């Protein structure tokens, strides 16, 4: 219901803990028209002409996605539009079981901004080629395995890149 009241567009890229399957809430629930859920393990582009942008995404369709080619099909033309992507992926290890990707692969996409999920810690705002990318982390730590400042990213994204800033949000802070 909250997403139905939201006046914008929402996109969801299911990850390894909430992967897309016929039995998942993503498939079984009725979602508002302003919500797009990526259901394919391969990147898909959703055109948003009224917003002047294209939004890419891919879903986990199993608890593990070890294929490291998630970004090879993503090549954004220099067409004056903003090209965004939401992706649950792992930058930390080339042999990861959780959709391994590299900064070099990110740089080849031509995306304006890549919003990453998987790591629950803010990565800093990073750049590869013309693409800005980041893990925002999680808005609220859940235990002593999620230490440090938690929050979200806020900013502006356009055809030439993104200007993002971390906004602290958590009410609780876990520290050792």
Would you name each region that the model predicts?
Residues 1-134, 138-151, 156:
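His/Asp/Glu-rich metal-coordinating catalytic cores
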Residues 144-176:
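C-terminal functional module detector
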